[in-house]
Design a protein with these regions (language model features):
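Formylglycine-dependent sulfatase
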Residues: 3, 9-10, 14-148
Length: 148
């Protein structure tokens, strides 16, 4: 009996949340921004750059959106992610060689302005980053929830 009440309560909460989100989305005039970063995906690994493996959904995203084809990346994820988040070269903030593991002290300097912070100032109230962080774990000031 208790499981049923919990299930009903969770369902009501979930539906209420969806209704609230849809009403918020209907009043938001900002265009959606979706950035996809894929590890180990080469330029020619997608069908719209000539590969034989079909990637129709990625092609549709490029056709209906924008493809950024001039960029700088590092061979490991932390410097690349930090560059994307700040718009700066990794050597400028000292994250240029390796992944920032959870036990390493330090991370992306909290004084660095990040993309989510810029979006917040531009009126984007609903922002999300999904996937790995790897820009500092040892102290709360480096956590992603503190970064806009």
């Amino acid at each position: 009996m208790v499981k049923r009440h919990v299930l009903v309560a969770l369902t009501v909460g979930w539906v209420t949340g969806l209704c609230c989100l849809s009403s918020i989305a209907a009043t938001d005039n900002h265009p959606n921004i979706v950035i996809i970063v894929a590890d180990d995906l080469g330029w020619a690994d997608v069908s719209f750059h000539g590969d034989q493996i079909k990637t129709p959904n990625l092609k549709r995203l490029v056709d209906e959106g924008a493809e950024l084809s001039r960029f700088y990346v590092c061979p490991v994820c932390s410097p690349t992610r930090a560059g994307l988040m700040t718009g700066r070269y990794p050597i400028r903030y000292g994250l240029m060689r390796a992944v920032v593991p959870p036990w390493r002290k330090g991370g992306l300097d909290p004084a660095e302005v990040t993309l989510p912070e810029v979006l917040a100032k531009a009126g984007y109230h609903h922002r999300g980053i999904f996937g790995k962080w790897h820009l500092g774990h040892s102290h709360v000031k480096y956590h992603p929830l503190r970064r806009g």
